[in-house]
């Protein structure tokens, strides 16, 4: 397999004689085998985008390639760009992009194999403290979860004009609200322009003893209360119905991105994201790392809660690996396997699971 067709950089054209528009030849050698099962071409092992005072830092580590060119996705490159934004199989470049409110996406193109498109994950603001892209993670098979397709957040309530404008620019077409009716009434969502609204109430059945944790909190057992709620998010009837609706909505055809959220964007949303990433093949350690990011994004809320209510309530404001352990343990206890949970617990058939993978994965080889 020759890599000419796979090694195009956004905005560069290729003539019939196999040359870039500026006359440089495309690599025509065979793509090297990059793993033990015969897959060809480059594979990105790690890649990340971070916004700093100097610009966007794009870093990567790849195998099966000798050079990676970084470009702004969807923009024709200047000669200066072509000369400066590239590196070896492992590299790091600083791109001084002034995005003027627009969220820049970067295309990482190896000299052999498919390109990878990434953006910065953190798009939070003061009121949308836990707003982030759910994509940008590598699967165990070497594919990557698409960015710009799924967002997770805290409640879309009490937003500033700037917050609303930022949401509008994300291209969100559907918002899925995992909150209880009382939460939705007190703090209704401010929807992005043109977005549809879907309710998937995880704790809809307040009479379910699994979600009745008031006595635990009253007795100072806040940690145990959250552990119990995480188990309920797996096995209670209302939760299974809500998460089934979440994933059926995600799998449905349609253009535009989807955003799902609860109140803080950490527990109900955290489990939804953990299920999605696991379904897509993201390694468990990465799933946990993503889950725990809520502590970093919500640092100010956690500190404010400790100051106002006392440190005893910190377990209610934070996420803990043990909370996610409780949910995955409940999957094993009730359903035996994660696949059984998807199919028996949530009613996702092979077609829906395949649709989710097709829609939200970009090939890594």
Where are these predicted regions, by residue range?
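Bacterial N-terminal signal peptides that target proteins for export
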Residues: 1-8, 12
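The Walker A (P-loop) glycine that initiates the GxxxxGKT/S ATP-binding motif of P-loop NTPases
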Residues: 260-262
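Ser/Thr-glycine-rich phosphate-binding loops at phosphate-binding pockets of nucleotides
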Residues: 264, 268-269
């Amino acid at each position: 397999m020759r890599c000419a067709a796979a090694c195009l950089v956004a905005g560069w054209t290729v003539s019939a004689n196999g040359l870039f528009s500026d006359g440089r030849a495309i690599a025509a050698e065979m793509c090297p085998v990059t793993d033990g099962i015969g897959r060809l071409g480059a594979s990105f092992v790690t890649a990340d985008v971070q916004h700093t005072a100097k610009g966007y830092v794009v870093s990567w580590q790849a195998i099966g390639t000798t050079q990676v060119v970084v470009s702004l996705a969807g923009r024709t490159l200047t000669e200066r760009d072509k000369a400066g934004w590239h590196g070896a199989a492992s590299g790091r470049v600083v791109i001084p992009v002034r995005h003027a409110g627009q969220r820049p996406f970067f295309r990482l193109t190896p000299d052999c194999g498919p390109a990878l498109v990434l953006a910065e994950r953190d798009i939070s603001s003061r009121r949308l403290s836990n707003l982030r892209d759910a994509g940008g993670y590598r699967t165990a098979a070497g594919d990557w979860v698409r960015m710009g397709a799924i967002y997770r957040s805290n409640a879309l309530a009490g937003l500033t004009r700037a917050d609303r404008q930022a949401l509008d620019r994300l291209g969100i077409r559907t918002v899925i609200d995992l909150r209880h009716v009382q939460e939705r009434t007190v703090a209704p969502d401010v929807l992005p322009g043109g977005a549809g609204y879907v309710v998937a109430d995880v704790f809809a059945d307040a009479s379910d003893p699994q979600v009745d944790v008031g006595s635990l909190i009253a007795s100072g057992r806040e940690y145990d209360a959250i552990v119990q709620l995480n188990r309920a998010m797996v096995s209670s009837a209302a939760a299974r119905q809500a998460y089934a609706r979440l994933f059926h909505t995600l799998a449905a055809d349609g253009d535009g991105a989807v955003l799902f959220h609860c109140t803080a964007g950490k527990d109900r949303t955290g489990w939804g994201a953990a299920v999605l990433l696991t379904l897509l093949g993201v390694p468990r350690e990465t799933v946990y790392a993503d889950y725990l990011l809520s502590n970093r994004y919500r640092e100010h809320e956690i500190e404010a809660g400790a100051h106002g209510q006392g440190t005893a309530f910190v377990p209610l404001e934070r996420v803990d690996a043990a909370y996610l352990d409780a949910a995955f343990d409940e999957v094993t206890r009730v359903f035996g396997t994660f696949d059984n949970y998807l199919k028996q617990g949530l009613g996702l058939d092979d077609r829906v699971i395949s649709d989710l993978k097709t829609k939200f994965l970009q090939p890594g080889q």
